[in-house]
Amino acid sequence: MVSSRASRRKRASATDIYKTCKQSGTCPPDVVNKVEGTTLADRFLQWASLGIFLGGLGIGTGTGTGGRTGYIPLGGRPSTVVDVTPARPPVVIEPVGPTEPSIVQLVEESSVVSSGTPIPTFTGTSGFEITSSATTTPAVLDITPASGSVQISTTSYTNPAFADPSLIEVPQTGEVSGNIFVTTPTSGTHGYEEIPMQVFASHGTGTEPISSTPVPGVSRVAGPRLYSRAYHQVRVNNFDFVTRPSSFVTFDNPAFEPGDTSLTFEPADTAPDPDFLDIVRLHRPALTSRRGTVRFSRLGKKATMFTRRGTQIGAQVHYYHDISNITATEDIEMQPLLTSESTDGLYDIYADADIDNAMLHTTSHTGSTGPRSHLSFPSIPSTVSTKYSNTTIPFTTSWDIPVTTGPDIVLPTASPNLPFVPPTSIDTTVAIAIQGSNYYLLPLLYYFLKKRKRIPYFFTDGFVAV
């Protein structure tokens, strides 16, 4: 079985390959030599042509063309085409002599000038004839009115040059005082018109949208970023920058200068202030607060360079002047209205001024555990006119002194013998017996498991802290 061979694809011509690969420099050497004529055969012919003449023979490495005249077939001659030149009329060239004028007249001379159509002439007496006739019949017009109704029309015109005094309208009295209110009589019948009133805004909750598509939230206008890297910061210490900013850029007359608008200047070589050199525009001012000061700011644009197209190139500068400092809030110390004295170790006790049978005595008892004391309160004279008075007495928190209730609490039965409280240390738990109808235990003896609270000590009417 004969296997089929793949068909060989024809390569592009050397000229096509040379056009595409010459620019990139990837042409094969044989293609370059063939197109440029630098093959070995071409070089041999060049060397041989130095000694012999081979011109016109068409000998070369290229396609054979037979030279300039082509190949001549055997047994015949090549067909030739004879070009016949069309005949042209001869042009007579007239020589110009030295005495003849050199001005060429484009229009030939003519002695006859056409004057147009001649005007016709009329001869004789013929023409329009005018005849006159005379009649003796007078022209009589019939002025007898025709039968029927008679219509009379009258038309009057007013002459502005003359006006009858009876037709002049008397001018009304005008108000020359400062009162702008015109009063009208209230008596009688007055005409009026009822106009229905329309409600423009109904009462609602106040949250209804005022547009068809309300924008959620509040949109705020972003302030100028004056302290970014795009602006060069320049501080101006002169206060004239606030009132007369143009005096720093140009030498002009400050008779009129708007201070709240943008200012435009022409480029100048010099400026009163070197910091304002090449400034062509100062924007409108802005008041800001920066680090505890009220600051007056203006943005300026410089035109340092100009391109050939007229484009201005320059930096943007932030000029600012601190007007005043924002002082911090002063801390005013509050003064007390009443002077207070030190009451270390003193407590206030409300006592009844009407009780006279109470006595202050201290009794010492000696036992097996130690001595003990008993403290009672006598009747204290009142310093005010009310029933109860406030008297300050010294008081110490000793463990061996039991305290009874105040004299203002009347008990139904009172025991003459007070219970004995043995002195113990603070670290150990003791049992406390207090005679009274109402009392609070010492907060130090409470056992708090999780959270502790600060409980104040009270020693007032009916409340005793031990």
From Swiss-Prot:
Keywords: Capsid protein, Cytoplasmic inwards viral transport, Disulfide bond, DNA-binding, Host endosome, Host Golgi apparatus, Host nucleus, Host-virus interaction, Late protein, Microtubular inwards viral transport, Phosphoprotein, Viral penetration into host nucleus, Virion, Virus entry into host cell
Pfam families, per the entry: Late_protein_L2
UniProt subcellular location: Virion; Host nucleus; Host early endosome; Host Golgi apparatus
Changes after translation: Highly phosphorylated.
InterPro entries the UniProt entry points to: Late_L2 (IPR000784)
Quaternary data: Interacts with major capsid protein L1. Interacts with E2; this interaction inhibits E2 transcriptional activity but not the DNA replication function E2. Interacts with host GADD45GIP1. Interacts with host HSPA8; this interaction is required for L2 nuclear translocation. Interacts with host importins KPNB2 and KPNB3. Forms a complex with importin alpha2-beta1 heterodimers via interaction with the importin alpha2 adapter. Interacts with host DYNLT1; this interaction is essential for virus intracellular transport during entry.
Protein role: Minor protein of the capsid that localizes along the inner surface of the virion, within the central cavities beneath the L1 pentamers. Plays a role in capsid stabilization through interaction with the major capsid protein L1. Once the virion enters the host cell, L2 escorts the genomic DNA into the nucleus by promoting escape from the endosomal compartments and traffic through the host Golgi network.
Family: Belongs to the papillomaviridae L2 protein family.
Protein name: Minor capsid protein L2
Record organism: Human papillomavirus type 70
Gene, per the UniProt record: L2
